[in-house]
């Protein structure tokens, strides 16, 4: 599933190509994603100019004068940009579900083999959208700080990894990056969240930010389907320390990385280095 770095990579790829441009048409090949696409989306968007693009948690936001297009990549989605000079614009396959065509010939194509993503039109206040209004702070923002995390975790007895992946606590820290951040902070994913000392919260905030920044720099992780707006894979997976490395040597102590299930998600850690 694309996590925050992959969504941010996508945002940075599409924004320069569509901001300020006017939608000419929308081609809908498949309406049934996680939530059904409005069949009138083409009529709604035609003639509207894109004011800006943004991201909140794992949601991409395309802003217009009187509404927003909220896009979630689901388990396997991606957005590709095709320009008039690209001979592949007309070539689509069964996984290419939506094309947004701009007046200059640019096409933004939504591809989703597993059809678990979403493209939603909303004309209310952005922050009040039901999918956005209860989200926690962005992990790369100043709001996600030591004091904030320490207070939030003090009231929680569940495992720290589960708390870290809760979008009400902090957004966008999915399974891959939770595993990697906890390893680099030396904290066991099983530790009760309310047992973390303040200095450990400070270290965890630092490692979460560092891991996410590095992942964005490397274009995110490509394990199966993810590609950026140019169709290129990310390569942060080459820098994994524990994720996906079950029974392989820990890069710090040489002991074996363990895989367990926590909250129905694969959890990778080093029992020697993480306490």
UniProtKB/Swiss-Prot annotation:
Organism: Neisseria meningitidis serogroup A / serotype 4A (strain DSM 15465 / Z2491)
Subunit structure, interactors included: Monomer.
Documented EC number(s): 3.2.2.23, 4.2.99.18
Gene3D superfamilies: 1.10.8.50, MutM-like, N-terminal
Positions that bind DNA: 95, 114
Listed name of the protein: Formamidopyrimidine-DNA glycosylase
Biological role: Involved in base excision repair of DNA damaged by oxidation or by mutagenic agents. Acts as a DNA glycosylase that recognizes and removes damaged bases. Has a preference for oxidized purines, such as 7,8-dihydro-8-oxoguanine (8-oxoG). Has AP (apurinic/apyrimidinic) lyase activity and introduces nicks in the DNA strand. Cleaves the DNA backbone by beta-delta elimination to generate a single-strand break at the site of the removed base with both 3'- and 5'-phosphates.
UniProt cross-references to SUPFAM superfamilies, sorted A to Z: Glucocorticoid receptor-like (DNA-binding domain) (SSF57716), N-terminal domain of MutM-like DNA repair proteins (SSF81624), S13-like H2TH domain (SSF46946)
SMART domains, per database record: Fapy_DNA_glyco, H2TH
ZnF (FPG-type) ranges: 241-275
Cofactor details (free text): Binds 1 zinc ion per subunit.
InterPro entries (UniProt xref): DNA_glyclase/AP_lyase_DNA-bd (IPR015886), DNA_glyclase_Znf_dom_DNA_BS (IPR015887), Formamido-pyr_DNA_Glyclase (IPR020629), FPG_cat (IPR012319), MutM-like_N-ter (IPR035937), Ribosomal_uS13-like_H2TH (IPR010979), Znf_DNA_glyclase/AP_lyase (IPR000214), Znf_FPG/IleRS (IPR010663)
Cofactors, names only: Zn(2+)
UniProt keyword annotations, A-Z: DNA damage, DNA repair, DNA-binding, Glycosidase, Hydrolase, Lyase, Metal-binding, Multifunctional enzyme, Zinc, Zinc-finger
GO BP, sorted A to Z: base-excision repair
Transmembrane segments: none
Family, per entry: Belongs to the FPG family.
Cited CDD domains: EcFpg-like_N (cd08966)
Active-site residues, as the UniProt record annotates them: 2 (schiff-base intermediate with dna), 3 (proton donor), 58 (proton donor), 265 (proton donor)
């Amino acid at each position: 599933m694309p996590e925050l770095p992959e969504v941010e990579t996508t945002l940075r790829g599409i924004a320069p190509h569509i901001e300020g441009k006017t939608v000419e048409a929308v081609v809908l090949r498949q309406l049934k994603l996680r939530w059904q696409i409005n069949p009138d989306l083409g009529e709604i968007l035609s003639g509207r100019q894109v004011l800006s693009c943004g991201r909140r948690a794992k949601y991409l936001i395309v802003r217009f004068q009187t509404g927003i297009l909220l896009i979630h990549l689901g388990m396997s989605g991606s957005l590709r940009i095709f320009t008039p000079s690209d001979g592949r614009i007309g070539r689509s396959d069964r996984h290419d579900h939506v094309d947004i065509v701009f007046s200059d010939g640019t096409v933004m194509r939504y591809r989703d083999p597993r059809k678990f993503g979403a493209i939603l039109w909303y004309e209310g206040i952005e922050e009040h959208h039901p999918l956005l209004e209860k989200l926690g702070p962005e992990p790369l923002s100043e709001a996600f700080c030591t004091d904030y995390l320490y207070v939030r975790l003090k009231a929680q007895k569940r495992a720290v990894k589960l708390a870290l992946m809760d979008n009400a606590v902090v957004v966008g820290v999915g399974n891959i990056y939770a595993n990697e951040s906890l390893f680099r902070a030396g904290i066991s994913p099983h530790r009760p969240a309310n047992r973390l000392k303040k200095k450990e919260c400070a270290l965890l905030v630092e490692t979460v930010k560092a891991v996410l920044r590095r992942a964005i720099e490397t274009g995110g992780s490509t394990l199966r389907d993810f590609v950026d707006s140019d169709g290129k894979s990310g390569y942060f997976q080459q820098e994994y320390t524990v994720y996906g490395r079950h029974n392989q040597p820990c890069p710090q102590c040489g002991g074996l990385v363990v895989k367990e299930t926590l909250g129905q998600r694969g959890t990778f850690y080093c029992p020697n280095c993480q306490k």
